């Protein structure tokens, strides 16, 4: 972990304080009423919770105390407690994305784009495209809003981290085609149900989702017009990794196997020869169209896959996920996300063995990681990406109080270069410190810390037009939660700097801008 490099004066300058230098030790550093220092979590337990969750709040600490580390981990790996506070669930339930059939959205979008293309008037065409784009952006924003509310408030904190991890791993870009209309459905149908489940099921769910098929062009992949984009990324980014021993010929063979895997935006079924009618598959917008499929036999990674319809695709996925390279690739990526930018090879090896032994049981692989000596030794040393930083700051500052406006959170993520559904290329966002620890990034974190610490971020300005919740002023971070779960892992330099804060608001900003708070 980095040492604290800023003096208290420098911190005050960076955060823009105009207060005189006043030490508020009695107000800011004495334990909250009824709290004894002996009740604090150990440093290791506090940091362990910071890693397993998106950051501490009182409910999380209380649940940890009730269960202990082992049973708390069991509960998190099960991922069955996703009940949200009523005020948060009400916000989500009111979103159009919750009640608008996604298939109809896409069918309407395809029809509208065709109508717009046929317009003769350039101004009418421009206005019509703007209207459609605004509608799509509304649905993409609602998908983002829903995911952020879940990340901040769900008791299933590990599951929420894994939803973000897999959403980044199986990245789609909302601004391509009509993906913006599909982003929320992609999370809820292809990612969330399998986030702690079986990796093969997860791969197949993303493979069959129209967001992925639109984003990586497999909807255009047909026997007479091969498109290799998705086949290449399925091997390189989703299952095997780079330099995993496959060849361009393997990519080509997989592309042929994936022909006919596409999207159905028409009501009428394709005309099929009688012998192939039973091979047509339609599930929502997903379609396997035998007329567009290459039924030849193919050889993938040395294994022959006989022509036979969508069963070929399932066979190909089985071949990919059972490769030792796949086990190691996924283990390496999980360990990079949770443990270290360069995770210990011994840990990656152990996780890969669990992956193979369990046939890709994600929860089992995570358990191997969380219960390892290497994981314990890494606590407090993994740099937070913007998503982790922002969500953990809101969780600590407001401690379960329902926010009413997610726009500031979205803006903070955008400003740090990590918007949800916003990564153009399929490789997803980087998970290493060097990607997020530049001087510009640090300045943005200071601004976020100040906005949250001062209470003027606008998080309680109801974005749906209703009355604002009865929350005024700035958050009080020097609470029992701070003394119980945060103070144990702060350095002496940070604790000394906090005593130099000239106001409670500045104290908040100092804490959220401290080096320790940027690590987990």
Question: Model features per residue range: what roles?
Answer:
Residues 4-23:
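Bacterial N-terminal signal peptides that target proteins for export
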Residues 123-126, 143-144, 179-400, 405-409:
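Active-site substrate-binding loop specific to GH73 endo-beta-N-acetylglucosaminidase modules
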Residues 21-31:
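Bacterial N-terminal signal peptides
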Residues 65-68, 77, 206, 369-373, ...:
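A general structural motif at alpha-helix termini
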Residues 37-60, 94-96, 323, 327-358, ...:
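Flexible, low-complexity segments enriched for small/polar residues
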Residues 53-57, 81, 170, 174, ...:
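Short alpha-helix boundary/capping elements
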Residues 58-169, 173-184, 190:
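N-terminal accessory alpha/beta regions
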């Amino acid at each position: 972990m980095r040492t604290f490099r800023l003096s208290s004066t420098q911190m005050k300058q960076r955060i823009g304080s105009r207060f005189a230098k006043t030490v508020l030790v009695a107000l800011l550093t004495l334990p909250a009423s009824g709290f004894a220092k002996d009740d604090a979590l150990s440093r290791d337990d506090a940091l362990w919770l910071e890693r397993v969750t998106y950051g501490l709040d009182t409910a999380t600490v209380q649940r940890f105390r009730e269960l202990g580390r082992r049973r708390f981990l069991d509960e998190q790996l099960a991922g069955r407690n996703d009940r949200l506070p009523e005020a948060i669930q009400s916000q989500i339930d009111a979103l159009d994305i919750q009640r608008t059939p996604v298939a109809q959205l896409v069918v309407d979008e395809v029809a509208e784009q065709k109508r717009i293309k046929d317009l003769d008037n350039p101004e009418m065409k421009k206005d019509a495209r703007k209207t459609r784009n605004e509608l799509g952006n509304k649905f993409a924003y609602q998908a983002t809003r829903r995911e952020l509310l879940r990340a901040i408030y769900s008791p299933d904190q590990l599951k929420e981290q894994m939803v973000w991890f897999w959403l980044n791993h199986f990245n789609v870009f909302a601004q391509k085609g009509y993906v913006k209309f599909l982003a929320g459905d992609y999370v809820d149908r292809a990612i969330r149900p399998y986030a702690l489940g079986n990796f093969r099921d997860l791969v197949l769910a993303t493979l069959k989702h129209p967001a992925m098929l639109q984003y990586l062009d497999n909807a255009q992949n047909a026997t007479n017009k091969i498109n290799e984009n998705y086949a290449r990324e399925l091997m390189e980014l989703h299952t095997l990794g780079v330099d995993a021993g496959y060849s361009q010929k393997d990519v080509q063979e997989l592309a042929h196997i994936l022909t006919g895997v596409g999207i159905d935006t028409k009501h009428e079924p394709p005309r099929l020869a009688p012998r192939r009618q039973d091979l047509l598959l339609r599930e929502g917008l997903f379609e396997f169209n035998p007329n567009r499929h290459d039924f030849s036999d193919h050889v993938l990674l040395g294994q022959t896959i006989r022509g036979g319809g969508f069963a070929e695709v399932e066979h190909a996925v089985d071949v990919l996920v059972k490769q030792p390279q796949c086990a190691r690739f996924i283990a390496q990526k999980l360990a990079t996300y949770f443990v270290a930018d360069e995770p210990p090879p011994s840990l990656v090896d152990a996780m890969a063995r669990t992956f193979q032994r369990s046939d890709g049981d994600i929860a089992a692989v995570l358990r191997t990681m969380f219960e390892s000596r290497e994981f314990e030794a890494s606590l407090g040393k993994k740099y937070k990406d913007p998503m982790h930083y922002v969500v953990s700051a809101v969780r600590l500052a407001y401690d379960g109080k329902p926010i009413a406006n997610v726009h500031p959170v979205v803006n903070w993520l955008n400003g740090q270069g990590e918007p949800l559904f916003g990564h153009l290329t399929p490789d997803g966002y980087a998970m290493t410190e060097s990607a997020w620890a530049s001087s510009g990034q640090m300045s943005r974190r200071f601004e976020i810390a100040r906005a949250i610490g001062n209470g003027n971020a606008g998080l309680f300005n109801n974005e749906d037009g209703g009355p604002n919740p009865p929350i005024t002023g700035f958050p009080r971070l020097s609470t029992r939660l701070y003394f119980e779960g945060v103070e144990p892992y702060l350095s002496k330099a940070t604790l000394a700097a906090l005593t130099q804060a000239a106001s409670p608001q500045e104290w908040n900003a100092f804490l959220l801008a401290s080096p320790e708070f940027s690590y987990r």
